[in-house]
Amino acid sequence: TEVIAHLIEKYSKETDFLEACIKSGKELGGYFALSIINTDRPDEIIAMKKGEPPLLIGRDEKQNVVASDTRAIALYTDNVASMRNGDIALIRKDSIKIFNNGERVEREFKPIDKEEMTTDKGELLPNIMKKIVSGDKIA
């Protein structure tokens, strides 16, 4: 992962951050799903996907988020879109722009079926995982 950061830093000296991420992604071999934040622009996320690893974008009226799993994103948003191979997204609080092969593309956002992710007590599974990790007892 340090290699990726160094590549982005190298290209950032000659172009903007999004283009630096695009150029860096072209040099990376194998499959990846990345979420990149620039400390100079903490209100932006660059999401990049190559190959099979899952990468999702969630959106609602208040925020846009990125995660690799629907259950992780379900606590923060109600709608989700799957990124496709080669997608690069520029995500801000109030906007999402997705590109593939240099062209702007649209991805379909679908409602998350939170019912299938709940326990018999009606609690979202990510909440249960938080309790397990934090050491809370589950009766």
Labelled PLM ranges:
Residues T1-A139:
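Conserved short alpha-helical segments that host acidic/polar catalytic motifs at enzyme active sites
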